[in-house]
């Protein structure tokens, strides 16, 4: 069983900043391209979702990807491009899952690790008071 512990990251500016469970991940596309990116462990996200510009960094051709419509806070609808990617969390915790890319995440500047692919396969412990969280292979 493998376990990784991450400190919470501070997101935002000045008195608007909040500490959140962020993991430094490596996204690996089937073409072999990879990019390091931050992702929020989000229990409310149905699946893993990243900014659209990450798909471009990975060299993915949007015209060749499956599309879907996703909704988030405020029920805003976003066109989302989907592909299967490998996500490396470090320390040998690696998984392949369907990932969405949408311009709706570009402003956030980070991705989401959601239920499908992530929470369904790993035990995740949040210790908000200590500002740490841990991911453990099941």
Give the ranges of each region predicted by the language model.
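Pepsin/retropepsin-fold aspartyl endopeptidases
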Residues: 1-138
